[in-house]
Design a protein with these regions (language model features):
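Terminal transmembrane helical anchor/hairpin motif
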Residues: 2-7, 58-66, 181, 186, ...
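Secretory targeting signals
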Residues: 11, 15, 52-92, 116-185, ...
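Cytoplasmic juxtamembrane interface segments
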Residues: 15-21, 93-106, 170-197
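Helix-loop-helix units of permease transmembrane domains in multi-pass membrane transporters
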Residues: 28, 91-126
């Protein structure tokens, strides 16, 4: 059943208001149909394919083991996991605000949170579905020469996978939140934030780098962390996991508030 037919059937049945789950599912379906027709999704897929080419090249050059795998992880956590969601999610909600179309999807008012959840699901779920197996494949390639080490390194793989999933969700929610606030130029705003905060501040030798998503993801994935001047800071990996996990619902709530107030804004 098409989206329009589903809405008409709901109206004919006399439904007063779609539930959060139903509305989010419809928003996600509509968003995915729009995304897969565009070029951005193919650009993101091509970017996520780069690490597999990279790991193959390094393996041919004689690099193996956990060192090779962590070299690949640097590519994921410094560039792909933060910046690909910026391409796919920054304008997901912002375009609805700019075009003022978020109020016309349903015959009856739908929960505003459903728009945010549906849009994020449509942009984040495909990225997770690509990154999780590609990381596992990179790990297998890195361990081929020393396959006996797989039993010792698979817990590291699990922590990397956890960090990747949490990172994609958090950065997708971050991109949507910033894009909602700066809906005229969402991608530019998100890229500026990522470069200033998630890249420069996260690598600075100061305790403030703990406020960045990037620092906690690296802590979860057992990647090198910047030295902290004047004081040593140690956070258990599960503490970073809880922090990264809390970011997504918090940013989704902020984005929902932004959507709720969008129809009353007069600056557009």
């Amino acid at each position: 059943m098409s989206v329009a037919a589903e809405q008409n059937a709901r109206a004919a049945a006399g439904d007063q208001r779609p539930t959060m789950t139903e509305a989010a599912r419809i928003y996600a379906r509509m968003s995915w149909l729009r995304i897969r027709r565009g070029r951005m999704v193919w650009m993101a897929a091509a970017l996520f394919a780069l690490p597999l080419v990279y790991v193959a090249g390094l393996a041919i050059a004689g690099h193996w083991g956990r060192g090779l795998f962590d070299d690949i992880n640097e590519l994921y956590f410094r560039f792909l996991i933060p910046f690909v969601p910026a391409l796919t999610a920054s304008a997901a909600v912002a375009e609805e605000i700019e075009n003022k179309t978020f109020t016309f999807v349903f015959a009856r008012p739908a929960p505003r949170g459903a728009l945010v959840i549906g849009k994020l699901w449509a942009t984040t779920a495909p990225a997770v579905a690509v990154v999780v197996p590609s990381l596992a494949l990179a790990w297998v390639v890195a361990q081929l020469r020393f396959s006996g080490d797989m039993a010792d390194t698979w817990p590291h793989l699990l922590r990397v996978e956890l960090a990747a999933v949490l990172g994609l969700c958090a950065y997708g929610a971050l991109a949507a939140a910033i894009g909602t606030l700066f809906s005229r130029h969402p991608l530019v705003a998100v890229l500026v934030y990522l470069m200033l905060i998630e890249t420069l501040l996260a690598s600075a030798p100061i305790v403030l780098n703990l406020v960045t998503i990037a620092w906690h993801l690296r802590n979860i994935a057992e990647l090198p962390l910047p030295d902290t001047a004047f004081m040593a800071v140690t956070v258990p990996w599960w503490g970073s996991a809880l922090a990264a996990l809390a970011v997504t619902p918090g940013l989704v709530s902020l984005t929902t508030i932004g959507v709720n107030g969008a129809e009353y804004r007069t600056d557009r």
